[in-house]
Each structure stands twice: as C-alpha cells, then as structure tokens.
Amino acid sequence: MKFYKPKPRSILSFDVGIKRIGLAYCDPLCITSNILPAVKRVEDNKELKIIRNHIKKFNLTGFIVGLPLDEKGKMTPQAIDCMNYGQLLSNELKLPFSYVNEHSSTWESSNRFGIKKDKSGLIDSFAAKVILEQWIKEGPELEELAGKGQIKY
C-alpha cells in the first residue's frame, strides 16, 4: 500500500510502550516537530489527563500512534497493545488519527540523537518524533476511527 504526504495539521505522535508513552507534536504547517516529556502508563489510564492538557495547550487537531510491526510488516503482541491504546485514545479524545509503522524507531532515535541507556523516557519521546517525521513525509492521512473494536491477540 502506497501512502501520500498528508495535509498539514498540528498533531500529537505517540510511541506507546508497556511502561511509558513517548510524545512529540508538530506545528500546524508540519514544519517543526518537538518532543514532550514521556508519560508513565498508569492504572485506569490516568495519563489521559496529561495528554488532554497537551492537546489543549498546543491546539492539536489529530494524532498518530506508532505500531511496532516486525521486519516483514506483520503484527506483534506489542503492536496489538498499541492498536488497542490508539482505539482508547480515539474514543476518549474524539480526534482523527492514524497508525504508522514504527519498526526500529527507538533504534533510529538512539543512534540519531545519541541517547543510550535511558530510563527517563527521553528516548521514547524522540522515537515519537521519528514516527511523526515519518508521518509528515509519508502519511497516511488521519481518519475518524472512534468506536472501532479492539484487536485481540
């Protein structure tokens, strides 16, 4: 499937992990991207309050969620968790969104930004920035996906 450069808009990018979620956002023209502090995943999804605050503060109009597919582009258990979290975000935030193949984004951000052995979440947010930059170049366009069922593994 070939994607095309999406229309410019200010969006939030998520690198969803088991313990933390890396965050990055771009300006409405998709010219600059910036990282935000990673948030810890907590019970009852209490991190959504922080995410909502970022959306309001930066006037974000959509979001993307990285999917850690394997080398062949197939789903992994972590990718399924990311898809389910994306659906949760869609249902809670009521914003258009899309998934982006993030295979090797953490490795790329580690090499590109020189981050090693990070436990602060900085590498997660830089991975979200890499995912965002990929989306800006390649898409796909954001869609209204709220209410779709969760994927089981």
Curated annotation (Swiss-Prot):
Q: Which SUPFAM superfamilies match?
A: Ribonuclease H-like
Top-level taxon of origin:
Bacteria
Q: What class of enzyme is it?
A: hydrolase
Q: Which is an annotated Pfam family here? A: RuvX
What Gene3D superfamilies would the database entry show?
YqgF/RNase H-like domain
UniProt key word Nuclease: yes
Any one GO biological process: rRNA 5'-end processing
Q: What is its EC number?
A: 3.1.-.-
Name the predominant localization: cytoplasm
Q: Which residues form a coiled coil?
A: none
Record's subcellular location: Cytoplasm
- What Gene Ontology cellular-component terms does the record carry? cytosol
Keywords of the record, alphabetical order, are: Cytoplasm, Hydrolase, Nuclease, Ribosome biogenesis
Instruction: Read off the SMART domains from this record.
Output: YqgFc
Q: What GO annotations for molecular function exist for this entry?
A: nuclease activity
What the protein does comes down to: Could be a nuclease involved in processing of the 5'-end of pre-16S rRNA.
| Family the entry assigns | Belongs to the YqgF nuclease family.
HAMAP family found in the cross-reference section = Nuclease_YqgF
What's the protein name?
Putative pre-16S rRNA nuclease
According to its UniProt entry, this protein's organism is: Prochlorococcus marinus (strain MIT 9312)
Upper classification of the source organism reads:
Bacteria, Bacillati, Cyanobacteriota, Cyanophyceae, Synechococcales
